Amino acid sequence: MNLRPLTSLLALFSLLGLKARAADLRVGLIGLDTSHVIAFTKTLNDPKAKDHVPGARVVAVFKGGSPDIPSSANRVEGFTRDLLKYPEIKLYDTVAELVKNVDAVMIESVDGRPHLKYAQEVLPSGKPTFIDKPVGGSLRDSIAIYALAKKHNTPVFSSSSLRQAVQAALKDVKYGELRGATTFGPCDIEPTHPDLYWYGIHACEMLYTVMGTGCVTVQRTHTKNVDVVTGVWADGRVGTVRGNRATKGAYGLTVFGSTNVVSPEIKTGYAPLLRDVVKFFQTRVPPVSAEETLELMAFMEAADESKRRGGAPVKVADVVAANQPR
């Protein structure tokens, strides 16, 4: 039996595979103190991964880390070691050096406070940048980041993976005209951040995925284990987020429509988000607008202001005006 044709064919497939990998966009990760960097890298870099997303791969990392947040300080070294087991990944001492050696950037720091500083180093490059939640450690920082992106004509987007989960859950669901929605999810609080920025942002992003922009007022009820945040939209629709503490970390959604009320199953996972990220890197077209992301951040900031005022309604526009970059 002549094996030469088979051997040649296998060699060709191997060569094509190498060329395809060589054409992948080179991605740099900034801030290695979150489990997202491990999950994202496996999904992008490992063709054998269950939910592998092709088209980009992590080749550069910058450690970062925040000593005053235990979940950052206690994990950043271990996550860094795990990432450096990939032979294609190089650790850089500065963000500037990382940016020079990649095509696109993912700001991943679990701590939103350094995101503005990182953005100031990355966005002048013009390279497409995904910023993991939250965009910034405050509404003021978040507004400044998007202003910087506009100044340098650099495409930016931010999203929780729960956005894509909601989109998938509602793909073929009919409910007529949207009247409102309720979401729920975990809402652990980190003292260095506005209350909902840390974990409640997932359920808030779920709400905005359904409702879109246009929230006028926000009102919050707060107890030790629960936050209930209600937004009233300009057209009269009402959206509610319930953030749970000391309960099972589940996510849920109910959509109220003119013809139906639906509560679809929410299936979580990172692959749908990463498919959006890779497409964004390739096209430079953000799948989520700056307007929507900034209103989401303002919604959560308004919830904190409502808490400070004893649960009084707060106008989103007033919160935005009070948090313009200095």
What are the residue ranges of the model-derived segments?
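Bacterial N-terminal signal peptides that target proteins for export
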Residues: M1-S8, K19
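C-terminal segment of classical bacterial N-terminal signal peptides
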Residues: L15-R21
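N-terminal glycine-/serine-/threonine-rich beta1-alpha1-beta2 phosphate-ribose binding loop
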Residues: A22-S125, K150-K151, T213, R309, ...
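Hydrophobic residues in well-ordered beta-strands that form the structural core
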Residues: D93, I131, V156-S158
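C-terminal helix-rich "cap/oligomerization" subdomain common to oxidoreductases
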Residues: V105-M106, Q282-R326
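Short helix/strand-capping hinge loops at secondary-structure junctions
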Residues: G126-P128, K133-P134
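A contiguous active-site-proximal alpha/beta segment in oxidoreductase catalytic domains
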Residues: V135-H193
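Rossmann-like dinucleotide-binding domain that binds NAD(P)(H)
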Residues: A181-K248, E291-A298
